[in-house]
From Swiss-Prot:
GO terms for cellular component: chloroplast; cytosolic large ribosomal subunit. Belongs to the universal ribosomal protein uL18 family. Keywords: Chloroplast, Plastid, Ribonucleoprotein, Ribosomal protein, RNA-binding, rRNA-binding. HAMAP family: Ribosomal_uL18_B. GO terms for molecular function: 5S rRNA binding; structural constituent of ribosome. The lineage of its organism: Eukaryota, Rhodophyta, Bangiophyceae, Cyanidiales, Cyanidiaceae. Part of the 50S ribosomal subunit; contacts the 5S rRNA. This is Large ribosomal subunit protein uL18c. PANTHER family: 39S RIBOSOMAL PROTEIN L18, MITOCHONDRIAL, LARGE RIBOSOMAL SUBUNIT PROTEIN UL18M. It is found in: Plastid, Chloroplast. Binds 5S rRNA, forms part of the central protuberance of the 50S subunit. GO terms for biological process: translation. The gene is rpl18.
Length: 105
């Protein structure tokens, strides 16, 4: 069991946060305690494509963009961290979108 946990810490973590107005996704390197990249509905490339920033379409676009950016950084495998949110609705849409664009978790 301990070895499994250590293996997970060698991978990057995709953290998802939802507020009332925006969708956020970060890829975090826990070994070095730093955020590698961050994408949200406030990111200009994402915001320009949306009229509403807190729906499933916004979550899908954030998932797509975070996956593309991660692949540009050479990150393919991540651990999905949804916090206390249920794997439902916007969280599920973001995860499926990131998977469809090449992230593995």
């Amino acid at each position: 069991m301990i070895n499994d946990i250590k293996q997970l810490h060698k991978r990057y973590r995709l953290l998802v946060h939802l507020s009332n107005n925006h969708v956020y996704a970060q890829i975090i390197d826990d070994l070095n305690n730093r955020t590698v990249l961050s994408v949200s509905t406030l990111t200009p490339q994402v915001k320009s494509k949306l009229s509403i920033t807190c729906n499933k379409k916004a979550a899908e676009l954030v998932g797509e963009y975070v996956a593309q950016q991660a692949l540009n950084f050479g990150i393919r495998n991540v651990v999905f961290d949804r916090g206390r949110k249920l794997y439902h609705g916007k969280v599920e849409v973001l995860a499926n979108s990131a998977r469809s664009f090449g992230l593995k978790f």
